Amino acid sequence: LEHAWSRALNAEGGVKTPDILPGKNGSTIQSATSEALGQKRYLAMFEFVEGSEPDQQDDLTGGFEELGEIAAKTHVHSIDWDRPEPFERLVWDLDTVFGQDATWGHWRDGPNIGTQTRQVLEQVETTVIERLTQYGRKPDRFGLIHADMRLANLLITDGETRLIDFDDCGLGW
């Protein structure tokens, strides 16, 4: 799905993304087994895109404005886009982000979280949960999202910006 959406955004949504290169068999997803890993892994290859992420030492105002524009375009596109079947992606809801079995683990287990930081983040978590619960999960509010859209996932070259790293895309706010 992430490949289909990335291509559709590039073709229809006004968001530049790297092209996905098919293997010899024509599929954009390949599999390989390594003795070192002991199990099958799935692979994808993307075109190499020149560029660099916005420099955090610079004024990032323009970068965040562009990030907001790209986020808006992906949101608008995802509302009307016909998702391919079968559709299986991560769901980024309150349970998978804040719950006991959160997809990426619990923020409380992160490094260097002292008492003061923990207290602030607990207040933030409570507020986010309350607001998202009130906001609801109607289709125009909870749908397909990139889920890792940050300046580090923008590649800029010659005034053109590309959005990369769709592997976490799923359903969320």
Give a label for each model feature:
Residues 141-146, 151:
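Catalytic-loop of the protein kinase fold
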Residues 50, 149-151, 168-171:
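Short, glycine/acidic-enriched loop or turn micro-motifs at the edges of active sites
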